[in-house]
């Protein structure tokens, strides 16, 4: 199948560090399946500068064709295609005979709608922002609404986004599906590439929980680990909406917990002043983040405004009891007290959740880990890409 993938949320160069690679993972998996995928990155220049995104001149970069526009695609977007790119002129573009166009983020969706080719619209938190923020009411909201009506299908990046979109536009129900991301198999302890695939589920589960010990007294059975105090981890770029301060305040004064914070940003000095006992590591390479997760007991990040949240899946795969925000991000995959915990994004709720985890019985903790293990097996990058593609095939 020939797919044209359109989005500005895509690394132009393979060594680019600042752009999320979640959409890249879908493309890579589809290519492994034998499909041809061309990537078109339409870039609204002003938006690029306002958001501090990397800027590249228009042209072909490895497998990405980057096109810059001063205006947000008001005019004929096709006029900038040139014969030097892999996409070529408009005539050449049509000759590619793309079976489907997959477009993500507001700019990608608006651009795809301009092309006049059948497309799937991928909904992120940014799209919900355009549809609900009064600042976009006059111009962008009507254009995005029109594009969504024209889309053959709508792929929401999380269950939360699906529910938010359908609350706004219930008429889209028959063409909406959820397209979550999945973790790389190497990121999960039980899916390590070196692991013998013949191991049973029980063997895998024992490896998954190998760093956890359970009290044998179920009447007084608290969470006991090889770590004393209990190791709590959070990881994010220090933005206000990540609510790192709420985690620090929740742990402050709780002698049974030790908090480590991975990340950096403008808020760091303020955060460090809240509690001198918190361990700040700064930014770490991805493999070191995973190592920290595997050496922790609880991962908590009560952020808001998340499209999805790969870090939660990675924490679950690393054997952490994982806490996310209720009604945001990965809620719907994480189910409260079943395979993780949901919390309100305030320090009192986070503190209460941590104490609830500490007081889990042996049976409750065992059930939690079993369910978490079973959940994560369904969210690898390969499986998620396959399910996304299956949904696309349904509309063709």
Model regions: which residues?
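N-terminal subdomain of nucleotide-sugar transferases
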Residues: 1-53
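Conserved donor-binding/catalytic core segment of Leloir-type glycosyltransferases
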Residues: 4, 155, 200-202, 226-242, ...
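Nucleotide-activated donor-binding/catalytic signature segment of Leloir-type glycosyltransferases, i.e.
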Residues: 269-287
């Amino acid at each position: 199948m020939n797919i044209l993938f359109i989005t500005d949320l895509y690394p132009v160069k393979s060594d680019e560090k600042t752009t999320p690679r979640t959409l890249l993972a879908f493309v890579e998996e589809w290519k492994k399946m034998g499909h041809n995928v061309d990537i078109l990155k339409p870039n609204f220049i002003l938006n690029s500068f306002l958001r501090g995104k990397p800027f590249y001149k228009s042209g072909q970069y490895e497998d990405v064709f980057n096109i810059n526009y001063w205006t947000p695609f008001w005019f004929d977007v096709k006029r900038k295609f040139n014969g030097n790119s892999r996409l070529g002129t408009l005539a050449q573009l049509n000759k590619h005979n793309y079976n489907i166009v997959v477009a993500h983020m507001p700019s990608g969706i608006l651009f795809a709608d301009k092309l006049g080719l059948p497309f799937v619209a991928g909904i992120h938190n940014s799209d919900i922002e355009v549809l609900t923020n009064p600042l976009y009411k006059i111009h962008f909201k009507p254009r995005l609404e029109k594009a969504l009506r024209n889309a053959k299908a709508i792929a929401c990046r999380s269950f939360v986004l699906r529910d938010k979109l359908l609350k706004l536009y219930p008429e889209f129900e028959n063409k909406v599906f959820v397209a979550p991301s999945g973790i790389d198999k190497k990121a999960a302890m039980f899916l390590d590439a070196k692991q013998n695939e013949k191991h049973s589920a029980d063997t895998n589960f024992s490896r998954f929980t190998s760093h956890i010990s359970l009290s044998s007294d179920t009447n007084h059975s608290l969470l006991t680990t090889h770590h004393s105090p209990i190791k709590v981890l959070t990881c994010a770029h220090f933005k206000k909406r990540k609510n790192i301060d709420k985690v620090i305040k929740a742990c402050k004064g709780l002698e049974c917990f030790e908090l480590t914070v991975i990340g950096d940003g403008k808020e760091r000095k303020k955060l460090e002043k809240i509690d001198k006992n918190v361990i700040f590591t700064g930014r770490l390479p991805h493999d070191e983040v995973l190592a920290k997760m595997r050496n922790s007991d609880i991962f908590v990040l009560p952020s808001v405004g998340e499209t999805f949240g790969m870090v939660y899946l990675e924490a679950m795969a690393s054997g952490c009891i994982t806490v996310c925000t209720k009604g945001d991000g990965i809620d719907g995959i994480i189910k409260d007290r079943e395979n993780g915990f949901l919390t309100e994004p305030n320090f009192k709720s986070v503190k209460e959740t941590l104490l609830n985890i500490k007081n889990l019985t042996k049976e409750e903790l065992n059930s939690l880990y079993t369910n978490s293990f079973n959940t994560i097996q369904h969210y690898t990058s390969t499986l998620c890409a396959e399910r996304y593609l299956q949904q696309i095939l349904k509309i063709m």
